[in-house]
Amino acid sequence: KRLLQDLNIKINQVIPEGGSVQDLQNLPKAWFNLVPYREVGLMTAIYLEKNFGMPYISTTPMGIVDIAECIRQIQKHVNNLALNQTFNYESYIDQQTRFV
């Protein structure tokens, strides 16, 4: 959650955390899905991509290399969907990985 909050990205749903059946109707409103652990949620993300055209990111944001890769994938999806705006998260990546 912190990663997305740091990037000023609003979280639509965290499944299954505190979710209900009624919340599931909001799933297609998301721009993309982040699957931080492939063991949990990957099949759902694949289903949502196939049926609703929602891209997903399955890179686990752990370790310097994978955190940077995950953020770059987020940036790619956000820039593909954002209208009249371009996002660049390289300074955030630098800030998070420089002194590790």
From Swiss-Prot:
Residues in coiled coil: none
GO terms for biological process, alphabetical: light-independent chlorophyll biosynthetic process; photosynthesis
Cofactor note: Binds 1 [4Fe-4S] cluster per heterodimer. The cluster is bound at the heterodimer interface by residues from both subunits.
Entry GO terms, CC: chloroplast
Gene Ontology MF annotations: 4 iron, 4 sulfur cluster binding; ATP binding; metal ion binding; oxidoreductase activity
E.C. number(s) listed in UniProt: 1.3.7.7
Catalytic activity: chlorophyllide a + oxidized 2[4Fe-4S]-[ferredoxin] + 2 ADP + 2 phosphate = protochlorophyllide a + reduced 2[4Fe-4S]-[ferredoxin] + 2 ATP + 2 H2O
Assigned protein family: Belongs to the ChlB/BchB/BchZ family.
Function: Component of the dark-operative protochlorophyllide reductase (DPOR) that uses Mg-ATP and reduced ferredoxin to reduce ring D of protochlorophyllide (Pchlide) to form chlorophyllide a (Chlide). This reaction is light-independent. The NB-protein (ChlN-ChlB) is the catalytic component of the complex.
Subunit structure as annotated in this protein's UniProt entry: Protochlorophyllide reductase is composed of three subunits; ChlL, ChlN and ChlB. Forms a heterotetramer of two ChlB and two ChlN subunits.
UniProt-recorded name of the protein: Light-independent protochlorophyllide reductase subunit B
Organism: Polytrichum commune
Name of the gene: chlB
